[in-house]
């Protein structure tokens, strides 16, 4: 019976507004279905996630949702879950492991997100732009693939160059700190055309750093980021951000459906894609009102 399902969910942490939305959405979907969801917050540490997955295996759960903090180092614990015949669904990120070790991945195509951000920026600047980049957590599939996608587009434009790139760890505080160092290193905004941030929270931190340095976001430096959290829509409505690409946080439904399908012996695709659109300031106020 579906109502009797017990699912373990190992979440990375709560480093961003988007991550919190994802957690709340998955918890709400489990409650709606009457599932028993065992939740573990890893606080950004892979060792905590591995412990959590082993605990879920020991408890004999029916399925495991894993949002992997980094791409590598999962083979052993995934093999343990497979031996226990517990399906593992990767949530919003991927792993560098044999795909037979997990049931499916429910996630956006991060490369597409990076490419979409770069395409928008190329059109906005006529292919001429010095870019500073705030990368996500080092080693995460989101950071690796968003950068790869972005770079794949700007490589076609000789006058689009990333002049500074550093991780802000997907946090607002990290984004602010790194943007402060970028502005200091470049002597302000005069040599910077745009900021590409791997998530909105880092962009929001960077916007604060710009304002404190007397730099006008969107006027002196264009701002494009990914996630579509409520606060970035407020920033766009206030004229402080230019574009965001939505990362869909509502991944619980397709993840739970995949586990149910596997229990029935049905074939499950190895990647269930959940990509969202690019939003601009013209709809920002209405989107903020809907999402806040």
Q: What kind of feature is each model-predicted range?
A:
Residues 66-82, 150, 164, 168-234:
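Hydrophobic alpha-helical
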Residues 6-33, 37-51, 55, 59-61, ...:
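Extracytoplasmic "Venus flytrap"
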Residues 18-35, 113-117, 141-160, 174-179, ...:
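Short, solvent-exposed amphipathic alpha-helices that sit
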Residues 5, 134, 138-142, 153-154, ...:
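Hinge/cleft segment of the Venus flytrap/periplasmic-binding protein
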Residues 7, 49, 105-131, 144-145, ...:
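Hydrophobic alpha-helical segments within soluble ligand-binding/sensing domains
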Residues 72-112, 123, 130, 136, ...:
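Flexible loop/hinge segments that line or gate small-molecule binding clefts
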Residues 1-6, 31-32, 36, 76-86, ...:
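Short, low-complexity disordered leader/linker segments with a strong preference
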């Amino acid at each position: 019976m579906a109502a009797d399902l017990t699912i373990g969910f190992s979440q990375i942490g709560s480093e961003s507004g988007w991550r919190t939305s994802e957690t709340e959405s998955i918890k709400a979907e489990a409650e709606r279905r009457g599932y028993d969801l065992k939740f573990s917050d890893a606080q950004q540490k892979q060792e905590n996630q591995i412990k959590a997955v082993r605990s879920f295996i020991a408890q004999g759960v029916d399925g495991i949702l894993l949002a992997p903090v980094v791409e590598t180092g999962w083979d052993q614990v995934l093999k343990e879950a497979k031996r226990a015949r517990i399906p593992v669904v990767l949530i919003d990120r991927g792993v560098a492991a044999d795909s037979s070790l997990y049931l499916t991945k429910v996630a956006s195509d991060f490369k597409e997100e990076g490419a979409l951000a770069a395409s928008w920026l190329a059109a906005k600047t006529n292919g001429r732009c010095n870019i500073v980049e705030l990368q996500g957590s080092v080693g995460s599939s989101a950071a690796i693939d968003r950068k790869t996608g972005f770079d794949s587009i700007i490589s076609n434009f000789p006058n689009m160059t990333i002049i500074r790139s550093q991780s802000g760890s997907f946090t607002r505080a990290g984004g602010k700190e790194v943007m402060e160092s970028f502005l200091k290193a470049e002597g302000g905004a005069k040599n910077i055309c745009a900021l590409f941030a791997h998530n909105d929270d880092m962009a929001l931190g960077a916007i604060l750093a710009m304002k404190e340095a007397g730099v006008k976001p969107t006027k002196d430096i264009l701002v494009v980021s990914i996630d579509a959290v409520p606060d970035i829509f407020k920033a766009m409505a206030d004229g402080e951000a230019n574009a965001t690409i939505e990362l869909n946080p509502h991944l619980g439904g397709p993840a739970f459906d995949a586990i149910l399908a596997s229990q029935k012996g049905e074939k499950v695709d190895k990647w269930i894609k959940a990509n969202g659109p690019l939003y601009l300031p013209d709809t920002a106020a209405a989107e903020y009102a809907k999402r806040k």
